[in-house]
């Protein structure tokens, strides 16, 4: 069979479109049959049509299971993580499966961990193209270079450039809230000159132990580097982490999220919290 010959769907026998088909270890699924799979499932290129049939049978059986699912705990924006503690089960209240009214009911033992992963804005405004982002530049419009401007030192000492929420502000918040082990801040948090990038959004990354679902991710709305919005979304993500840790018997962070440097009322400090971190001083 040639490379561009028509491929047939292993499930329904119809033609599998070149651009919309799903590859299996042996054969393909057409776009219509592909939509029957769970939106969180993955690894199909290493699976067979027998795996597809088993998965679809499980998806159909899940309808009855979900009909008896009664959540008594939830966390996150729009209650994205919902738990039925009596049955020891949970669902993700977002994504295709949720929208279609048949979210997979997972056992609590299938959830291995959850991490908060910030996404950073890789494009920082620099009107004079001197390597110093405008929010840190005391002399916009000059040709002063980032090296001469001691960019790394400024990046270390500031968390809020012109009232924005960036990587340094996030690190301060993470430390004060006791969430260090639950937040992954990658190397893309700073630009090539060492300046902290603004936080664009947050991702919740759930690691799963399930035959068909290895990882589930939820993406927040854009926080656009705004302290109030960023802190609110971070708190909501932290609530998900806290609930998961309680369910799994892990230590739960007790610190609050109030940050005096942000000029916001913040969240209520919990008893026995980590000491509050000092604010960042703006240059004169």
Enumerate the language-model features and the residues they cover.
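Short functional micro-motifs and their immediate structural scaffolds
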Residues: 17-18, 38
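Cys/His-rich Zn2+-binding "zinc-finger" mini-domains, especially FYVE domains
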Residues: 5, 16-17
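Short linker/helix segments within small regulatory modules
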Residues: 19-28
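Short coil-to-beta-strand transition motifs
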Residues: 100-112
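Acidic, Ser/Thr- and proline-rich intrinsically disordered linker/docking segments
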Residues: 114-267, 274, 279, 283-284
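Residues immediately within or flanking Cys/His clusters that coordinate Zn2+
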Residues: 4-9, 27
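Anionic N-terminal interaction surfaces
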Residues: 28, 37-92, 96-100
């Amino acid at each position: 069979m040639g490379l561009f010959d028509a491929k047939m769907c292993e499930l329904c026998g119809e033609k599998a479109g070149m651009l919309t088909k799903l590859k299996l270890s042996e054969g393909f699924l057409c776009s219509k049959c592909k939509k029957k799979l769970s939106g969180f499932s993955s690894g199909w290129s290493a699976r067979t049509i027998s795996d597809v049939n088993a998965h679809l049978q499980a998806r159909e059986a899940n309808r009855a299971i979900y009909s008896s699912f009664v959540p008594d705990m939830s966390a996150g924006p729009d209650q994205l993580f919902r738990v039925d503690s009596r049955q020891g089960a949970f669902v993700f209240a977002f994504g295709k499966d949720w929208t279609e009214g048949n979210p997979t009911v997972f056992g609590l033992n299938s959830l291995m961990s959850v991490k908060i992963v910030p996404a950073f804005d890789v494009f920082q405004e620099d009107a004079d193209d001197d390597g110093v982002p405008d929010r840190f530049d005391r002399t916009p419009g000059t040709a002063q270079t980032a090296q001469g401007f001691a960019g790394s030192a400024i990046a270390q000492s500031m968390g809020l450039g012109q009232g924005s929420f960036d990587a340094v502000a996030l690190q301060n918040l993470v430390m004060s809230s006791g969430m260090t082990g639950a937040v992954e801040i990658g190397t893309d948090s700073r630009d090539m000159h060492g300046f902290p990038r603004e936080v664009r959004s947050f991702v919740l990354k759930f690691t799963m132990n399930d035959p068909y679902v290895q990882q589930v991710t939820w993406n927040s709305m854009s926080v656009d580097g705004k302290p109030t919005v960023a802190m609110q979304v971070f708190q909501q993500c932290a609530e998900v982490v806290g609930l998961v840790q309680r369910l799994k018997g892990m230590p739960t962070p007790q610190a609050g999220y109030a940050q005096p440097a942000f000029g916001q009322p913040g969240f209520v400090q919990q008893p026995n919290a980590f000491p509050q971190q000092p604010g960042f001083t703006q240059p004169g």
